[in-house]
Structures are given as C-alpha cells and as structure tokens.
C-alpha cells in the first residue's frame, strides 16, 4: 500500500507558495482555459488578437498582459487564411515571438511531446492556443462521456501545470440556449470539472456586438460587452461579479423592493400585480420569482413568506425596519 501523503493545516498555512500567474490579468491564468462560441462568431479573430497581445506585451480587451512567446495551433485553418488575418491586425512588424502550426498530433499520442519539444526550444513560451479541441482528440467509445472529457483535459492540465503554460482550448457551443451560458459548451460537465477557467462568447448572427462570460477557480466572475468590427474585438463595457448578480435580478423584484409599504403587505399574486400595476408578469410565476430571489429581497429589508388557506394562496411581504427606523425610543 502506498502511504497517503498529507500536510497539516498548521504547516499549510505557514508555507509560502508562489501565486498562480495570470498571463492576461483577470482572464487567462496558468492551466487550462476553455473558450466556446458559435461557429463563425469571430473566435479565431479573438484568439489571434490574444496571441499578438501577449507576444507584444500589449493590453488585450483593456486587460494587462505579460509579454511572452505564444504558439497558436490553427487546426481548422490554412496559412493563407492566417496571413490574411495578420495583414488586417498587424500594423507594424509582425512579432517573432508568435508561432503558428496548422497541423499537430493527437492528444494522448504526439501532441504532448510536440508541445514539450517546442517549449524546450522556446523557453519563453507561456501561451498555447489549440483551435479547436475537437481536432486533437479521439473519443473513446468504451468510456462514458464525462470520464472521456475529464481524462482528455487532465492530460493537458498536467502538461500546463508542469511547464507553467496557459493552454487555451477553443470549443463549440450547443445550438440550444441555456440560462447558464457555461452549460452551452459542447460535451459533458467533465470539461467544466477539469478546466481552470471557462469563457463563453455569445453573439447573434449578423450582429457586431457580443457578450463574453468569464468564470474560473482563480478569476472573478465577469461579463464583458464587446464589439466586433473589421476583425478587431473591442471592449464596450465590463461587469464584475456583484454587478452581474444585480443584472440577473428581474425588474419585477426590484419593483417589489421599492413598492412594499412600511406596514407590510399580504394577499394573492393577482392582488399584488394589480396593486403594483404590473401587467407584464404572469400571475403563475409571481411566487416562483419571489421565492427564487428571496435572498435578494432579504438583503434589501424585505422578508418574503407564503401560506395557504382554505380559500387562497397568500403572499406576505414584511419590511424589516433598520436600526435608524426603529420604533423603540429609549
């Protein structure tokens, strides 16, 4: 039996560790990052700009980068198409520290050794982009989808962690939409479990604006509003974790916070909508919305309750007085 290697909490808390480095502050760190987006949405343009920004040490979407060598495996493109994109994006001399390949080995076969070999010849390499993930993997028909996805990424993660690399995997999205954008990534949740960060690009057809959703183990959750023009992505607006949460709260809930009288209120969902003069919310979803966002209501001084009587289903909304509004005078 191999003995379990452990560390005490006391030792762990007293041991200095190098912080995980971020190649692009707030976006790309060491390890595995998955970026997914619809076909023909501009993902490859974005990845090329990311490579150029890192190679030149320039900001990417207004985020600071650390200058380093970059390797872009454009496995669904050819050199002619890459050259056309470079002509559009490069104003001066093209950086020698950005390298391309349009062919690569398969994961679990030659790819890992190819990356190790390239790193040995280019010690300053820190960014590897693989476009796309599907081009380097061979699904195992005898393994379930979760196990296959997890094993696939674990192999790359071990490589990234061991060599201090940021490996970005370009992936596709499902056609079916979801409230959680990260659930739209093609494949099982094994991809989410094994990755360090996930980025989803949502862009409607024939629109030049898009939303970039970002989440990760060492990253603050963010949402970026972007614009795509002439092959270039630019930042329009940025939302942090708290602002994202605020945006996810329906207007109806914000209206409830403003409306509830000091003495509180009780009645049916129909009566609530009538008294608030709300016409765009179905009575059938009122209790669901109130219950789903009861924590937000409580943070804003309103306690939501629900009870059934013989004749009706009643909603109670009680406004909690703050310390300044206390009715007790001593």
Describe each region flagged by the PLM.
Residues 28, 51, 72, 131, ...:
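Conserved RecA-like P-loop NTPase ATPase core
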Residues 53-67, 298:
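Post-Walker A helix-loop "phosphate-sensing" segment adjacent to the P-loop in P-loop NTPases
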Residues 29-33, 68:
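Pre-Walker A (Motif I) flank of P-loop NTPase domains
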Residues 2-4, 10, 18-19, 23-24, ...:
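Conserved inter-motif catalytic segment of the P-loop NTP-binding fold
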Residues 88-97, 188-192, 296-297:
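Short, conserved catalytic or adaptor-binding loops enriched in Gly and charged residues
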Residues 222-330:
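DNA transaction DNA-binding modules
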Residues 46, 50:
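Hydrophobic positions on the alpha1 helix immediately C-terminal to the Walker A/P-loop
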Residues 19, 34-36, 40, 44-45, ...:
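Phosphate-binding/switch region of NTP-binding enzymes
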């Amino acid at each position: 039996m191999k003995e379990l290697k452990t560390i005490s909490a006391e030792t762990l808390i007293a041991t200095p560790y190098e912080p995980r480095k971020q190649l692009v502050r707030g976006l790309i760190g060491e390890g595995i990052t998955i970026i997914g987006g619809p076909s023909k949405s501009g993902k490859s343009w974005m990845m090329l700009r990311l490579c150029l920004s890192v190679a030149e040490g320039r900001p990417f979407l207004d985020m600071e980068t650390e200058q380093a060598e970059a390797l872009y495996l454009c496995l669904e493109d050819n050199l002619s198409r890459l050259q056309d994109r470079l002509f559009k994006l490069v104003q001066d001399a093209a950086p020698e520290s950005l390298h391309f390949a349009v062919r690569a080995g398969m994961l679990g076969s030659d790819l890992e050794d190819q990356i190790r070999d390239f790193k040995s010849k280019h010690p300053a390499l820190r960014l590897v982009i693989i476009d796309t993930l599907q081009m380097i993997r061979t699904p195992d028909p005898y393994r379930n989808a979760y196990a296959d996805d997890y094993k696939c990424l674990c192999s790359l993660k071990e490589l990234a962690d061991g060599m201090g690399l940021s490996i970005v995997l370009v992936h596709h999205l499902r056609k079916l939409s979801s409230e959680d954008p990260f659930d739209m990534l093609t494949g099982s949740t094994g991809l989410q479990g094994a990755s360090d960060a996930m980025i989803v690009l949502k862009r409607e057809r024939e629109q030049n604006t898009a939303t970039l959703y970002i989440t990760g183990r060492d990253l603050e959750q963010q949402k970026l509003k972007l614009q795509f023009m002439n092959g270039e992505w630019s930042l329009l607006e940025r939302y942090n974790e708290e602002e994202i949460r605020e945006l996810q709260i329906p207007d109806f809930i914000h209206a409830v916070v403003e409306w509830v009288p000091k003495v509180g209120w009780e009645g049916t969902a129909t009566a609530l909508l009538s008294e608030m003069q709300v016409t765009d919310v179905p009575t059938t979803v009122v209790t669901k919305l109130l219950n789903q966002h009861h924590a937000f209501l409580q943070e804003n001084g309103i306690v939501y309750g629900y009870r059934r009587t013989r004749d009706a289903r009643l909603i109670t909304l009680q406004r909690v007085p703050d310390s300044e509004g206390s009715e007790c005078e001593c």
